């Protein structure tokens, strides 16, 4: 027995999204019977090939069967609630996962392009930390984080000389993750913009942003904001661990 990723799927949601795209299914109106059958065929194929199936694939299989059975149950008119669709939670998770994949692909392309450019070394500047009180329960969505990233990118580009095509050392996502983790060691939150000097290479900004996306997805950090247009805070998540 050995473990592989069938067609390089990164988990059950990745497989489910692949099936939705392959069969051109409307993600907002999923035909649960057809999709469940296709998903179960993949799971059975993995079993027949003696592939060690991760438990998360089986958990999602059970969830799909439960949703399918709920939708097949007869309902009287009085029982029907248009706001109580058993697919709602699954659709929300699929859309969120799809957004992460799309944004990560775009940022990876940008990082690969910028790896070919050399810019001047960062100048030491004071960080933008603030001591304002804040409520740790105001999370933000991915769109607001993209807007914040664009603000940093624009400011960095204003302070960056035009490119010369010379390879430079690569700043890795692992290094960016370690920087963020270290910043949270002694303080449970910090200002998102304080990560940047605004004179660093743009690829370093992109790498930091990719790291923040991955850490947020893994529950290592939360990304929070009091009100629209105010400062964004990076906060320890439930899975945060230093060292």
Swiss-Prot record:
The lineage's top-level taxon is Bacteria
Keywords annotated in UniProt: Cell cycle, Cell division, Chromosome partition, Cytoplasm
Primary residence: cytoplasm
Q: InterPro entries annotated for this entry?
A: ScpA (IPR003768), ScpA-like_C (IPR023093)
Annotated GO CC locations: cytoplasm
A biological process (GO) of this protein is: DNA replication
Q: Report the subcellular localization.
A: Cytoplasm
Subunit organization: Component of a cohesin-like complex composed of ScpA, ScpB and the Smc homodimer, in which ScpA and ScpB bind to the head domain of Smc. The presence of the three proteins is required for the association of the complex with DNA.
Q: Function of this protein?
A: Participates in chromosomal partition during cell division. May act via the formation of a condensin-like complex containing Smc and ScpB that pull DNA away from mid-cell into both cell halves.
For this chain, the family text in UniProt reads: Belongs to the ScpA family.
Protein name, UniProt field: Segregation and condensation protein A
Tell me what organism the protein belongs to. Staphylococcus aureus (strain MRSA252)
- The gene coding this protein: scpA
């Amino acid at each position: 027995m050995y473990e592989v990723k069938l067609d390089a799927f990164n988990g059950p949601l990745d497989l489910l999204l692949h099936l939705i795209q392959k069969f051109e299914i409307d993600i907002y109106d999923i035909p649960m019977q057809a999709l469940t059958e296709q998903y179960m065929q993949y799971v059975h194929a993995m079993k027949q090939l003696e592939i060690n199936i991760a438990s998360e694939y089986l958990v999602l299989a059970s969830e799909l069967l439960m949703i399918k059975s709920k939708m097949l149950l007869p309902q009287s008119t009085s029982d029907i609630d248009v706001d109580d669709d058993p697919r709602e939670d699954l659709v929300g998770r699929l859309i969120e996962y799809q957004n992460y994949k799309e944004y990560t692909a775009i940022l990876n392309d940008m990082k690969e392009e910028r790896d070919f450019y050399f810019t001047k070394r960062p100048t030491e500047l004071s960080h933008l930390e603030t001591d304002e009180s804040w409520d740790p329960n105001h999370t933000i969505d991915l769109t607001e984080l993209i807007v914040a990233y664009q603000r940093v990118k624009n400011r960095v580009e204003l302070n960056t000389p035009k490119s010369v095509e010379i390879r430079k050392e690569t700043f890795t996502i692992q290094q960016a993750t370690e920087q963020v983790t270290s910043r949270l060691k002694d303080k449970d939150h910090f200002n998102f913009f304080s990560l940047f000097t605004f004179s660093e290479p743009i690829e370093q900004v992109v790498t930091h942003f990719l790291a923040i996306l991955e850490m947020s997805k893994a529950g290592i950090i939360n990304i929070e904001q009091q009100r629209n247009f105010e400062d964004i805070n990076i906060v320890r998540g439930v899975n945060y661990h230093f060292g």
